[in-house]
Regions:
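Key DNA-contact positions within bacterial/archaeal DNA-binding proteins
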Residues: 40
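Basic, helix-initiating cap at the start of DNA-binding domains
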Residues: 1-21, 25-37, 50-51
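C-terminal peripheral helix-coil segments that are non-catalytic and often amphipathic
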Residues: 84, 88-91, 127-138, 156-157, ...
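Hydrophobic alpha-helical connector segments
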Residues: 55, 69-95, 151-154
Length: 193
């Protein structure tokens, strides 16, 4: 029988707790209870809640990077890659309650750690998009533009369509979101042939 990885057990329990209760309301006691370990076990791996939260963010960010890199095919056009990455990230977001909870906590309480966590996630996405936009610009697939500005705008559009819209309307399907990305981006930055 394989040994139990207590550290991973703690991380999974903390992820679950942060996703259910948010950063502010999560306690080490809750994490210990969910992980079915003593509170002291948590402190053998993490000195405090902030360090545990940071590790979870590192894992989430790495998972998102892996998704993006897996879905980018060098032989494919920029927009084909964009839509593949978008599909996968939409599925990831749907299945990852932590990011949704952090956004809600930031909105409701303005928790600094929630803001910093979401900012880290956004920076990784922005850096990735900026690099891909630069490549697309160099290959002539998109018009001359500032990749950082376009990356920022793409992230805001993504958040608007996947989250902000849902506050007052029925959520958009993946196909609708892709359709709006096509409408707003391809007609705006795609090279006209």
């Amino acid at each position: 029988m394989a040994p139990i990885d207590r550290r991973q057990q703690v991380i999974q329990a903390a992820t679950q707790s942060f996703a259910m209760f948010g950063y502010k309301a999560t306690t080490m006691d809750q994490v210990a209870k969910i992980a079915n370990v003593g509170k002291g076990t948590i402190y053998t791996f993490f000195t405090n809640k902030e360090q545990l939260f940071d590790q979870i963010l590192v894992d989430v960010i790495q998972e998102m990077k892996n998704i993006a890199h897996r879905e980018v095919h060098q032989e494919s056009a920029f927009f084909e890659n964009l839509f593949r990455v978008l599909d996968s990230l939409l599925e990831f977001r749907r299945d990852h309650d932590l990011l949704v909870k952090l956004a809600q906590e930031l909105k409701d309480f303005g928790t600094l750690q929630a803001k910093e966590g979401l900012d880290k996630v956004e920076k990784v996405i922005s850096d990735f998009l900026t690099r891909e936009l630069e490549k697309a610009k160099e290959s002539g697939e998109i018009r001359d533009c500032d990749p950082q500005v376009v990356s920022f705008m793409m992230i805001r559009l993504y958040i608007a369509l996947t989250s902000d819209w849902n506050k007052q309307h029925e959520p958009l399907s993946k196909e609708q979101i892709k359709s709006y990305f096509r409408l707003f981006l391809m007609e705006g930055i795609a090279v006209v042939t």
